[in-house]
Amino acid sequence: MTAEIQQPPSQPPAQSSPMSAATDKHGGQPSAMESASCATKTKKTNAGIRRPEKPPYSYIALIVMAIQSSPTKRLTLSEIYQFLQSRFPFFRGSYQGWKNSVRHNLSLNECFIKLPKGLGRPGKGHYWTIDPASEFMFEEGSFRRRPRGFRRKCQALKPMYSMMNGLGFNHIPESYSFQGASGTISCPPNSLSLDSGIGMMNGHLPSNVDGMGLSGHPVSHLAANGAHSYMGSCTGSSGGDYSHHDSGSPLLGGGGVMEPHSVYSSPASAWAPSASTPYIKQQPLSPCNTAANPLSSSLSSHSLDQSYLHQNSHNTASELQGIPRYHSQSPSMNDRKEFVFSFNAMASSSMHSGSGSYYHQQVGYQDIKPCVM
C-alpha cells in the first residue's frame, strides 16, 4: 500500500516537466522578436539622421587654411587630413570620399607645390606648400567659394593692375622744366633710337655754316653718330635775345623763347644762341651756290626767325632742305639772302613738330626764294 501511494506523486513531476519546457519555449520567442524590432527601429532612426553639413569653402581654400595654420607653411597629406577633421565635423563621419577630393586638388591645381623629400625621410609623405604666385588669391583671409574661372581672371588682370600702378602721367614734368617767365626751357632727348644709323653728311655743314658764327660762338657741327638718338634737344633763352619776336605765340607768353638745337644729333652738340650777340650778315651769296664762301662781319645785326623743312620729292633718300630766313631790323638794309642747308637721310616728322610750334608772323618784309637744284 505504501508503495502504491508513493508512486502517484512521482508521476506529476514527470508530466509537469514537458509543460514547463514548452511554456519556456513560448516565453523565449517574444524576447527574440523584441530584440529584432529594436534593431530595426535603431536603423530607421540612424537613417533619418543627416551627416554634418559641408563647410562653405572649396577644397582649395580648405587646403590653404591647413597649410597657413602651420608655422613652417608646409604640411603632409596626413597632416592636412588631421587639420580638417579637427576643425570641421563634416570630415569626422563615416564618409571618406572627401580624402580623394583633397588629393585631387593638391595634385591638379597649380596653387600647390610638392616639395622634394629630404634625405632622411624615405617613403611617402611629401610636403605641400602654397605657390607664392597664387597667394594674392587668398589675401586678407578671403576663403569663400569663388565662381568658376575666378583664378584665370585674376591671373589675367594681375599684369594689367601692375602696369597701371607703374604708369603715371608725369611725362610733362619729367620731359620739360619750366623755370619761370624769363628762365630757360630744357627738353631732354627721347630714348628712341633709330634702327639704321641715320647720319648727317659732315661735308655740307662745314662748307655752308663754318664761316657763320655768333661773334665768338661758332656753330657746332652736327656729329654723325652710329647709334645716335632720335631726339630734339632744345634749350630756352630769355626774351631779350630776340627782340623782334611776337609775344602772342603760345610758347612765348611768359617772355621765354624756345629754339631747337641739333636735331638728330647727340645732346652734347647744340646750336647755342648767344645772350646779347646778334647774327652777322655776310657777303651776298648765290641762293643756289653750295660752295664755301668766306663770311665777313660788315653788316648789321640779324636774328634767326625760323627754319623750314620741306620734302624734296626728287630725292629717293627723302632729302630735306632747311631754309632759314634772316630778317633785317634796320630799315636801311635791303639785301636779303638765303643759305641752303642740305640734310640727307633725315626724317621730317619730329622736325616739323618742333619747328612749327613757334611759328609767328613778323612785322617786317620777308621773302623766300626757292632753290632749284
From Swiss-Prot:
Tissue localization of expression: During neurulation and tailbud stages, expressed in the lateral plate mesoderm and in the neural crest-derived structures of the head and branchial arches. During tailbud stages, expressed in the pronephros and pronephros ducts and in cells that migrate from the dorsolateral plate to the ventral region of the embryo (with the notable exception of the heart). These cells may represent hematopoietic or endothelial progenitor cells.
- Record's GO cellular component, any one? nucleus
SUPFAM superfamilies attached here?
A: Winged helix' DNA-binding domain (SSF46785)
**UniProt DNA-binding region:** 54-148
Instruction: Give compartment(s).
Output: Nucleus
Supply the CDD domains for this chain: FH_FOXF1 (cd20049)
PANTHER family reported for this sequence = FORKHEAD BOX PROTEIN BINIOU (PTHR46262), FORKHEAD BOX PROTEIN F1 (PTHR46262:SF1)
Q: What is the name listed in the Swiss-Prot or TrEMBL entry for this protein?
A: Forkhead box protein F1-A
